[in-house]
């Protein structure tokens, strides 16, 4: 999908509620190519990106950058380095969070105010913490295109870690010059860029007012109880995410001295429960490894069938000759 003369979007369909509509990878530049985000380390992301590169007659990537460390944005970095020769660019405060996903070489770090200079376009790097501690946005001022990762989504609202940081990041973005189009990490493009950012700011203010009203009206509540009142009809699969956003608001209100907190008591897991969880995690990883080996074997078999005569279909193949 062509966004501007400098930007193309590869939108990989998703059916998970936390990734509304699609997970997006962006190609920037008409000469040297920059990718923004990589998708997960599974075949649908690899093949859609490679198919798109082939369609636009590209065989290499110059730089593979990410907006933050979450797996659906950074899972394919090793593959982009190994298969397409990309230099990998990650947030300077996200290297530790990306442990296990970075290639052995060809890694550079990005900080607020840095630029990525391609043959025909300059991309600004903006630190926008809030969704995650290492969140970055990328901005092409001449096109008015802002790549937001999960700081802003194409549909709905995002999850928030530190609400104070997040509000400051939104305010910074809404004040960018020439802002026109938002390219989010998930979902469709947003063409009313400044209005959507202001909607996000207003939404967080509204949620804060709602939380305070719940506490004034009903007395002490847990974050989960507040969440159920604020989001009575939410998809149950999104309840934990909504509870996280409520807790982010409560933490900011506590820090400002506007509410008091009565400490809870965490449940201490029993040794047998911990052991079962570890065993299940080992089993889960083993299943994933077996599935990946199976997929690799299937691919090898598919290619072998292209290279050899179809002896598994024919005991003797038809032959053809001139009828004289």
Predicted regions and their residues:
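Active-site HxH/HxHxD metal-binding segment of metal-dependent hydrolases
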Residues: 21, 40-122
């Amino acid at each position: 999908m062509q966004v501007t003369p400098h930007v193309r979007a590869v939108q990989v369909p998703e059916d998970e509620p936390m990734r509304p509509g699609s997970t997006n990878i962006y190609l920037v530049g008409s000469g040297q190519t920059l990718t923004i985000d990589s998708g997960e380390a599974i075949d649908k992301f690899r093949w859609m990106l490679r198919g798109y590169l082939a369609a636009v007659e590209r065989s290499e990537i110059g730089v593979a950058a990410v907006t933050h460390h979450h797996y659906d944005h950074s899972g394919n970095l090793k593959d982009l380095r190994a298969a397409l020769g990309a230099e990998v660019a990650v947030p300077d405060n996200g290297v530790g969070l990306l442990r296990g996903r970075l290639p052995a070489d060809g890694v550079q770090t990005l900080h607020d105010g840095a630029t990525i200079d391609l043959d025909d376009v300059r991309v600004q790097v903006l630190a926008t913490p809030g969704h995650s501690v290492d969140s970055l946005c990328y901005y092409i001022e001449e096109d008015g295109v802002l790549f937001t990762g999960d700081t802003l989504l194409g549909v709905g609202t995002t999850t928030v870690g530190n609400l104070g940081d997040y509000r400051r990041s939104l305010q910074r973005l809404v004040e960018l010059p020439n802002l026109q189009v938002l390219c989010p990490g998930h979902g469709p493009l947003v063409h009313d860029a400044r209005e959507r950012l202001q909607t996000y700011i207003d939404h967080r203010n509204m949620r804060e007012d709602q939380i305070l009203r719940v506490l004034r009206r009903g007395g002490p509540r847990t974050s989960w109880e507040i969440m159920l009142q604020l989001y009575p009809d939410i998809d149950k699969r999104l309840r934990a995410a909504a509870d996280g956003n409520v807790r982010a608001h409560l933490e900011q209100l506590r820090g400002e001295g506007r509410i008091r907190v009565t400490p809870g008591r965490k449940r201490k897991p029993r040794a047998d429960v911990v052991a079962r969880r570890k065993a299940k995690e080992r089993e889960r990883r083993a299943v994933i490894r077996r599935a990946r080996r199976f997929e690799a074997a299937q691919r090898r078999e598919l290619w072998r069938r292209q290279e050899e005569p179809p002896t598994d279909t024919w005991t003797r193949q038809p032959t053809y000759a001139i009828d004289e």
